[in-house]
């Protein structure tokens, strides 16, 4: 924790240092993607980009992006296999595009002949809209990953199916993105039938043994968390604060401090990270979520059970679930062919937690643990294209 406070304090002082004498050369060191959204990153790298809004059954308006084909495939005809990708907590869909094109899963899949779609979870920067509710209202933020699974994912998949004419697609999730998939596919068999294969990277199902400093937050009572963070959104985008962090971390002498901060959060291996892209990673997170989502994750913390959100009273639970206690998610009910990857140094999804869920996946077709990987390596690791992405494509060709 002292390292985190030092990071935050120093980062806040950096803008004054810059304005005082231009001691640090900020502008010349920033990657252009820092200022771009997902669509702009796609086009900047020479790929075709499409952007759509999807309205869920409960009224949330979600922004999704599409890369219909790779850079060198404009002459190819016929439908391409569809892939949908779901990001982690506090991220957005630029998450899949933040390394160079030859190291980003979104671009690699497009170049491999796939029709790539990437969603944004409700409440993040790009999906903070609703047909009737304002983001200033507490009711807008009354959701967790339960609603993302119940409404967001079915709505997006229906949209993709209607747009492409293809009835089935591949699903790739990382971290909380896997949670959304597991909940949806285990509770909605009709949706599960549309999934050719479920690729789960660093799956968050069991959350009993995390060692990240970040998870100490979940030791606090729910009332204290609400007192500190409020009852609406949490870690919403703050461009000024984010630029302070980016300025700080762009300095070569100070990058080790940023590495330490990220290591405390979710593990970090700078030898497997392109440190010149650190500003791009930080520019697109955090993007925000609901405090209710955080409380649902807290509910999993050090628990033996994987349940729907507890609304806090028998009456409220009865109103939402028609029973006095939130229902268990039954992973054994999920019949989708599934592949899982885990990291041996992952401090959020530890090997012990992964071991607890594997017996519950009744159609597990592939499992691999990389002993040296942490939670970020799945999306940012320099060796991810060779060790992970190539295997994903191989399995897609097998389960077509």
UniProtKB/Swiss-Prot annotation:
Top-level taxon of origin: Eukaryota
Alphabetized UniProt keyword annotations: Disulfide bond, Glycoprotein, Hydrolase, Lipid degradation, Lipid metabolism, Secreted, Signal
Molecular functions (GO terms): sterol ester esterase activity; triacylglycerol lipase activity
Entry EC number(s): 3.1.1.13, 3.1.1.3
Gene Ontology CC terms: extracellular region
Active site: 175, 346, 375
Cellular localisation: Secreted
Tissue: Highly expressed in the epidermis. Also detected in other tissues, although at much lower levels, including liver and kidney.
Catalytic activity of the protein: a sterol ester + H2O = a sterol + a fatty acid + H(+); a triacylglycerol + H2O = a 1,2-diacylglycerol + a fatty acid + H(+); a triacylglycerol + H2O = a diacylglycerol + a fatty acid + H(+); a cholesterol ester + H2O = cholesterol + a fatty acid + H(+)
Catalytic class of the enzyme: hydrolase
Glycan attachment positions: 274
Family of the protein in this entry: Belongs to the AB hydrolase superfamily. Lipase family.
Protein name: Lipase member N
The organism of origin for this protein: Mus musculus (Mouse)
Lineage of the organism: Eukaryota, Metazoa, Chordata, Craniata, Vertebrata
């Amino acid at each position: 924790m002292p390292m985190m406070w030092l990071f935050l304090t120093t980062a806040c002082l950096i803008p004054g240092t810059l304005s005082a004498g231009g001691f640090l050369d900020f502008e010349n060191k920033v990657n252009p993607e820092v200022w771009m959204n997902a669509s702009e990153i796609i086009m900047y790298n020479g790929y075709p980009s499409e952007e759509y809004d999807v309205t869920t059954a409960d009224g949330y308006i979600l922004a999704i992006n599409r890369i219909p084909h790779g850079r060198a495939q404009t002459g190819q005809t016929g439908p391409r296999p569809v892939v949908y990708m779901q990001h982690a907590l506090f991220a957005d869909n630029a998450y899949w595009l933040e390394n160079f094109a030859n190291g980003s899963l979104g671009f690699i899949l497009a170049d491999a002949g796939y029709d790539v779609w990437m969603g944004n979870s409700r409440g993040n920067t790009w999906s903070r809209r609703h047909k009737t509710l304002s983001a200033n209202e507490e009711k807008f933020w009354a959701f967790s990953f339960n609603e993302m699974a119940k409404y967001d994912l079915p709505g997006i998949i229906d949209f993709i199916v209607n747009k492409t004419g293809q009835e089935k697609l591949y699903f790739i999730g990382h971290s909380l993105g896997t949670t959304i998939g597991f909940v949806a596919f285990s509770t909605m068999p009709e949706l599960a039938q549309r999934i050719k294969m479920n690729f789960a990277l660093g799956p968050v199902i069991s959350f009993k043994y995390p060692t990240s400093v970040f998870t100490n937050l979940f030791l606090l009572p729910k009332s204290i968390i609400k007192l500190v963070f409020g009852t609406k959104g949490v870690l919403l985008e703050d461009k000024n604060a984010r630029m302070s962090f980016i300025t700080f971390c762009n300095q070569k002498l100070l990058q080790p401090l940023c590495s330490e901060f990220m290591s405390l959060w979710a593990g970090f291996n700078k030898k497997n990270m392109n440190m010149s892209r650190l500003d791009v990673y930080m520019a697109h997170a955090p993007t925000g979520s609901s405090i209710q989502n955080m409380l649902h994750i807290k509910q999993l913390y050090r628990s033996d059970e994987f349940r729907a959100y507890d609304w806090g009273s028998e009456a409220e639970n009865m109103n939402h679930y028609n029973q006095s206690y939130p229902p268990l998610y039954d992973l054994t009910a999920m019949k989708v062919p599934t592949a899982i990857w885990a990291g041996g140094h992952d401090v959020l999804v530890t090997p012990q937690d992964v071991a607890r869920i594997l017996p519950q996946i009744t159609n597990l077709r592939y499992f691999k643990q990389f002993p040296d990987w942490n939670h970020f390596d799945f999306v940012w690791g320099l060796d991810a294209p060779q060790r992970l992405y190539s295997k994903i494509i191989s399995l897609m060709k097998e389960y077509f």
